[in-house]
Amino acid sequence: MLLLCVSVSKIQGGPFAGLEVAAIVPCYNEEVAVGEVIEGLKAAVDGITVYVYDNNSTDRTAEVAAQAGAIVRTEPRKGKGNVVRRAFGDIDADVYLMIDGDATYEAAAAGLMIETLLSGPYDHVLGVRTDDPEASAYRAGHALGNRMFNKLIGRLFGEPVTDMLSGYRVFSRRFVKSFPALSREFEIETELTVHAVNLRIPQVEVPVGFKDRPAGSESKLRTYHDGFRILRLITSLLQYERPLAFFSAVGAFFAAVSVALGIPLLVTYLHTNEVPRLPTAVLATGLALIAILSLVVGLILNGVLRQRQEAARLAYLTYPPVLPPAQTALELAALDRVQR
């Protein structure tokens, strides 16, 4: 099968003239809300190309999206992560905007987020949700879990994050084309955040409005199910992205148990020249060997990680930063003068 990466039409006028800007809207049964999202994006950014990825909806999501002026595509594999992977592979643009199709995010902030990306230039702009006091869209359980995961990611990866589970983001081409997109479901936001933190990609946060879903639409989030999946992903990412710390912690645990079991045996041996409880002595020795082996594995994987990070960084640097059209024109003119 031949897969083609589709280029987005360039914007003809306004502050983003000459740029290819694509909005990606993952949807599952969002016929009530998706039209509002598309209209809001088109009003905020004149000339933006909106792609709605229908994730096996059983309602009229695709029909409503097409009527609102979006390009509709279907991703048969269930899960937001599968949709994002497909969209990032399908679309070739200068700037990518990702927003959920449930109309809870402030689509009117799209222009500001894109301007912020270009002003850095940054490669990742995170829309931080500012909850409407009158709204209940941001459930208490989700808010608490989000704060916990934010602190956990900040502690593990060394960079503070305010809203790592936000579904409203803007990316540069080089962010998107260097992102592996391994997640299948809602943990994709965590993977996006860790990718930016791990490669030390220039990023910034922008506050955006967050409100209730339109009447008649239903949330697809499952607080405990999604929370456990995200926690499992963080553990997996810690294992693969911080192997020395992970396996050192594992080794330290086994070493502590080994010492706790072995010291009484050693004290008895020094007094009696006999080894009591031989099975315990064998267990303590085995745990000590596991501790040493864990440390060795961590050191080896840390070397492998360094090579992976170098390869990922080189893939990221393959693409130039996205710049405002005026700045790009000035740089091209300067380059032309130098060449002459």
Predicted regions: what they are:
Residues 1-16, 183, 188-340:
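Hydrophobic helical membrane-anchoring modules
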Residues 20-22, 49, 191:
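Cell-envelope/extracellular polymer assembly enzymes that use nucleotide-activated donors
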Residues 29-43:
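Short, well-formed alpha-helical segments that are part of the catalytic scaffolds
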Residues 30-33, 57, 80, 106:
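Donor nucleotide-sugar binding loop of glycosyltransferases
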Residues 54-62:
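A conserved acidic beta->alpha catalytic loop
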Residues 76-90, 107-186, 190, 211-228, ...:
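Acceptor/aglycone-binding surface of glycosyltransferases and processive sugar-polymer synthases
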Residues 96:
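Short aromatic/hydrophobic "clamp" motif used to bind/position activated sugar donors
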Residues 100-105:
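The conserved acidic donor/metal-binding loop of glycosyltransferases
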